[in-house]
Regions:
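Consensus positions within tandem repeat domains that build extended binding/scaffold surfaces
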Residues: 113-116, 143-150, 170-176, 197-203, ...
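N-terminal capping/linker segments that flank leucine-rich repeat
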Residues: 1-143, 159-166, 191, 218, ...
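Tandem repeat domain/solenoid detector
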Residues: 152-160, 164-169, 173, 177-196, ...
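Hydrophobic face of beta-strands forming the core of extended beta-sheets/solenoids
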Residues: 124, 133, 145, 157, ...
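Long, intrinsically disordered low-complexity repeat domains
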Residues: 196, 206, 211, 221-223, ...
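Intrinsic disorder/low-complexity signature
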Residues: 8, 202, 216, 234, ...
Length: 300
């Protein structure tokens, strides 16, 4: 199924907007849509603010027309139509708590997107519920999922969220610091075979208890697993990374802040690979591993 989906391209004749909701609790709340350029690409879009007003055409990520004042407190549906190469909240304290719901991705030409720090965002809509508005095909041109849902409060991840994103290479901090995430679905990264970095991908997911043993099996081009599961102290199983032979760094991949962690099983003998990848503190404090005593000092 993943291979089939990688071959599916967005129908350029279809135009669907990017839609999300914000909730304000005070009068005259100012909200700035977090537009960014990407690799020389600039926006060309309009914004319907959900209060009866619409912006003029915006052709710059720094345009003042991306800023809006909501006179009354309430919940507003913001609709972005046109071309938007980048939407990155980046933990912006002025807007992160205001975003409460992702309604649809639409098809707007996204290359990078993140809701980093949106701690009132608890779910990603399933692809079936979006079938009439582009599904997940609007993520088909995304190259970077860095900090994608970092610091949100997701309780689950749709297994097919990346199935239409064959060009994506960057998955650093993608689901980092999600304190409400307990499991990861099988096949999550199967379609992103060109991915090169999963650095800190699940860093600090302190409630995460298990991940599929095959999670990264298709990611043969990955070179960086630095800190991927760092401080995931409830995690019980350790991956072997058998198919990931191009990796140059596993530094801090399972680094735990203390020995009070649940990790068990046998550590992969990464230090025996040739060439030897960087493994600084890769298994620090992972004393529950059956071969912990034989792990070289520079890997723990």
């Amino acid at each position: 199924m993943g291979i089939f989906r990688r071959l599916v391209q967005s129908d350029s004749s279809q135009v669907y907007p990017f839609v999300f909701k914000i909730t304000t609790t005070a009068a005259n709340t100012v909200f700035t849509v977090p537009l960014v350029d990407y690799a020389g690409l600039t926006p060309s879009l309009t914004i319907s603010w959900g209060d009866g007003s619409t912006s003029p055409l915006i052709t710059s990520s720094s345009s003042t027309n991306r800023i809006h004042t909501f006179v009354a407190a309430g919940t507003y549906t913001i609709t972005i139509s046109g071309f938007m190469p980048g939407f990155t909240v980046n933990n912006n304290s002025a807007i992160r708590a205001l975003i409460t719901e992702l309604v649809q991705w639409g098809i707007v030409g996204l290359r990078t997107v993140n809701f980093y720090g949106c701690n009132n965002l608890t779910s990603i809509p399933g692809s079936s519920s979006l079938s009439g508005v582009g599904g997940y095909t609007g993520l088909g041109e995304v190259l970077s999922f860095a900090s994608f849902m970092r610091g949100t409060r997701l309780t689950s991840i749709p297994s097919d969220i990346f199935d239409y994103s064959p060009y994506a290479t960057t998955f650093s901090d993608t689901f980092g610091s999600i304190l409400t995430l307990t499991t990861v679905p099988t096949g999550l990264f199967d379609s992103v075979t060109g991915a090169t970095t999963f650095a800190s991908c699940f860093f600090g997911c302190t409630a995460l208890t298990s991940v599929p043993s095959t999670l990264f099996d298709q990611n043969v081009n990955a070179t960086n697993f630095s800190g991927t599961f760092r401080n995931c102290r409830a995690l019980t199983n350790v991956l072997q990374f058998t198919n990931n032979q191009s990796v140059s760094t596993f530094a801090n991949v399972y680094n735990m802040s203390s020995t009070s962690n649940a990790l068990t099983g046998t550590a992969p003998t990464l230090w025996l690979r040739n060439p030897t990848p960087s493994g600084t503190a890769a298994f620090r404090n992972c004393t529950g591993l059956t071969n912990y005593a034989s792990i070289p000092a520079n890997f723990k």
